[in-house]
Amino acid sequence: MQYLLSKLGDSLQFKFYNKDQTATAKYHCSKPRVDNLLFVNIPKCATQTIAAWAAQMATRDGKIEVPYRFTILREPYGRLKSAFAYGVGAKYQYKFTVEDIGNWFLGKQLPDKFSPNQVDLLVHFVPQHEFIANAPIEIEHYFNTGDMRQLRHILSALSGIDINWMQENTSRYSTQFTIEYNKWFSLNENYIHSYLQKDIRLYKDIFL
């Protein structure tokens, strides 16, 4: 997948194919804002869970005394599959298919102009290492999506409140989606592996 990126304040701005069309990805969990909670947001990496916990801290007057700079990574192949499932789902009114998304990912059969929903979806396929390399802060703590219970306990201790457990999203893929995705993956495995290579290395260096 081809894209250009540039920094825009504390965010990244992405341009896909048609350079007149842009999409912006926010870095920090800023709605609601919790002072000293500095989270580098990577799409499809438990961002909704962190936003929900931040909301609890904000409404219950949680306070973090010392800046806590962290991010969450996801196993790259699992993240890619999750992004496809997200793309074919309710968020985009079930208008996109695995074949559609796969073609855009590969740079094939591109529309003359992407819709706002298409551009928004493509942000979820930008590799994780791009968000890390261009982060506006120095990340001190790395977690993966299997560490959410541990992270909840850490944030509870830091903020001085007992953050309620929110069951993170679990991947439940339909049989039809799995068949279609596995077929696409098998046909394009070499390209996918090459595209994810830096993310695979990053994930292994930190967690394995």
Language-model features: where?
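General alpha-helical segment detector with a strong preference for membrane-spanning helices
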Residues: 48-50, 79, 203
